[in-house]
């Protein structure tokens, strides 16, 4: 596992403790991180770089190795009980995970850890093997705590300490956006020369425009409806309640809209909402809009692309977001986005061109923005064109090229070299 100094990487050890890359994104802890790990690995393999993805064996009788595609394997590491566990319990199995990873055969050039839990493992493995550690955080506890102070879903002190240790140990840090890079430096004291910004991508072959009426027919949606779509994990941080309350205000202000409006939520409960998976449906009933709301489980990407095409608007009202992959996927399908003006969404959405960014988290403000778009079909048409143009700049090939440059920098320069 000794790095080939002065050359591009030939083999990468990728670590994903939090969630398996084989899991269906959109529920539990599976989300954009899963998509990122899988899509970058596939494209690394296309360039001739082999990728081994190490993840926890979270179910009984899993095969030790699963081939994801030619050049990419997923290695299941026994660590803790062979079942899904609350992520709050995962720090207790990191020692077992680290030991299992160190026993695995392989000569790797670089370790790339995703999420702070993986980083705790990655720091030990990289140091033991004499190879550089590249770290992607995907979320930051201090940022989350600023918007969810003291609430369920906020980051505990042990997580903040763990994040700080990982950030200090990493040879290179990959930020999804300039905003995340600034947060790493300002909040965690990361050395600026070790922070590299690499925007995630989307599969532009899969997420592309299609016939809206056909998509709606496949999904059982009225062809003439005004469809608002929330896609992703259903948790407070993602703000599904904001969209639900905004929709209720729209309907109560215009009863005629009840015949046209469909509010769809595609995703599974995550975080604090896993204890009450029906909470979203209950909220719709309490607000008197149960007939207009449709709640669907997470679905494979081809079906998700149909949901994006079927939607009039995709709404991403996150209270915090390091990037917002859903927003770019939707725009790649030609659907404008109404999103919170937070974090990476300010990069994922081009305000006034591909969608609308909303300041604050007041449902009334979202209702106002959506109502204005309902009343202005010409603007919606312009935003559709802008969405396609903006999303075209987020293919995976550029992201992978930039990641490979980060790896080369880490291999050749070592710690502290830009």
Curated annotation (Swiss-Prot):
Q: Which residues bind 1D-myo-inositol 3-phosphate?
A: 29-34, 87, 115, 139, 159
Cite the Gene3D superfamilies for this sequence.
Glycogen Phosphorylase B (3.40.50.2000)
Catalytic reaction equation(s): 1D-myo-inositol 3-phosphate + UDP-N-acetyl-alpha-D-glucosamine = 1D-myo-inositol 2-acetamido-2-deoxy-alpha-D-glucopyranoside 3-phosphate + UDP + H(+)
Choose any GO biological process term that the UniProt entry carries and state it: mycothiol biosynthetic process
Function of this protein? Catalyzes the transfer of a N-acetyl-glucosamine moiety to 1D-myo-inositol 3-phosphate to produce 1D-myo-inositol 2-acetamido-2-deoxy-glucopyranoside 3-phosphate in the mycothiol biosynthesis pathway.
* A GO MF term: D-inositol-3-phosphate glycosyltransferase activity
Which residues does Mg(2+) bind? 308-309, 311, 335
Q: Which CDD domains match?
A: GT4_sucrose_synthase
* InterPro entries the UniProt entry points to: Glyco_trans_1, Glyco_trans_4-like_N, Glycosyltransferase_grp1, Mycothiol_biosynthesis_MshA
Q: Name one Pfam family in it.
A: Glycos_transf_1
The highest taxon in the source lineage is: Bacteria
Q: Which UniProt keywords apply?
A: Glycosyltransferase, Magnesium, Metal-binding, Transferase
Q: Which family does it belong to?
A: Belongs to the glycosyltransferase group 1 family. MshA subfamily.
* Binding annotation for UDP-N-acetyl-alpha-D-glucosamine: 24-25, 32, 233, 238, 321, 329
Q: How does it assemble?
A: Homodimer.
Query: Mind telling me what this protein is named?
Result: D-inositol 3-phosphate glycosyltransferase 1
EC code? 2.4.1.250
